[in-house]
């Protein structure tokens, strides 16, 4: 009986902790679905379609837009 109560309390605590420490606590699922809908309308907005620069191209130190490695004036 004690073990069952402890397990229930642990599960409730971990569930509450997960929701409390989530990255997007405001408008959780509602905001997620609106972003997904926007990306379906405009595939260019998807983060998966991010364009990157080839080896030897000038790159941006702030956005780190190289395909391989870290940008330092030129892509490695």
From Swiss-Prot:
Signal sequence coordinates: 1-22
Cellular location(s): Secreted
Expression tissues: Expressed by the venom duct.
PROSITE patterns, per database record: OMEGA_CONOTOXIN (PS60004)
Modification after translation, per record: Is not hydroxylated.
Classification via InterPro entries: Conotoxin (IPR004214), Conotoxin_omega-typ_CS (IPR012321)
Domain notes: The cysteine framework is VI/VII (C-C-CC-C-C).
Name assigned to this protein: Conotoxin Am6.3
Organism: Conus amadis
